[in-house]
Amino acid sequence: MSVISFPPSRFSPSEAHQIAKTLYGFEVSVKVLDSERDQNFYLKREDGKEFVLKISNPAEDVELIKLQVASLKHIANFDSSIQVPSTIQTVGGEFISRHNGCFIRLQSFLAGHFIKDIENPESFLLEEFGAFLGKLDVSFREFDYPDLKRKWIWDVRNIDFLKSHLVYIESESDKAVVRHFIANYQLNIVPNEKYLRTQYIHNDGNDYNVLLNDNGHISGVIDFGDMAHTFLASELAVAITYLILEEAEPETKIKSVVQGFQSVYPLRDEEIESLIHLVCVRACFSVVTANYRKKLFPENKYISVTEPYAWTFLKNFADKELNNFKIY
């Protein structure tokens, strides 16, 4: 059973409080955080120290959680200027524990504002955003976890997932839009895959996961649950996708983010040319997955929060000749 088709755990705040006390020896206040496929609780200790209690989806593979723990440790050791959550050990010295069929971790809480909170981010901030993602991927370039180069649903190369889940989209015209971008991917990306470097990437550097400090500068990143070993260019493609979904003319924003990334981790010409194709495919994953999961979990409104914007974006770009779209 996949984590996207299995319901999340249903721990109550009082149970989260008890877990914190039993496993970590903490007396805390508890607040529920929004989450898509697992459960997250904000914890605040009596001394003011803040944490996030992460309770995995019951279908989650523990090896994937170990991957996340290892990656956070690696980044912190490789480049201390990149703020990422640290994983807290239990009173028994464990980084991951199991409770009622779910794997549990406690992470430090990263304070800050989200890029999403900035109504019209200026070019310098978008360049800084791109440069931050570049730094993150430079650190990942030295990271390897060979047993888990998985075929993840959110890996843009997983076109078979899009094809097999089109049935969950009711509108034939909407299906046709997704098919258009699948065909576009197969025509423009597949023949050039040998030129596109692969490595581990965060794979979800959207404007809800990248943090700003009080001075308005990029400070850190959270939520490593979608990590994948895939195209390096996908890191930028994911970030760009969520930045421009609501933009009628996104070229300026795109160029700023790409310029920042290029200043730290230069992409090849073929990778630059692939970006707009990967952006459109990522938006397809957003709408297809949303339609699939909201049929399974209609009560979870978090699932489809970006879907309307993604459809507008895709229908707009379906009329464009992507190879003529100058992204940088």
Residue ranges: model-predicted function:
Residues 1-89, 213-214, 326-327:
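Conserved NTP-binding catalytic cores of kinases and kinase-like/nucleotidyltransferase enzymes
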Residues 12-20, 144-145, 161-203, 213, ...:
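An alpha-helical support segment within catalytic cores of ATP-dependent transferases
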Residues 36-48, 52, 87, 186-234:
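Active-site acidic catalytic loop and adjacent metal/ATP-binding pocket
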Residues 46-143:
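ATP-binding pocket architecture of kinase catalytic cores
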Residues 91, 119-173, 196-198:
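A cross-family kinase active-site recognition segment
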Residues 167-168, 285-328:
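ATP/Mg2+ or Mg2+-diphosphate-binding catalytic cores
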Residues 233-266, 282-298:
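Active-site activation/catalytic loop segments of kinase-like enzymes and analogous catalytic loops
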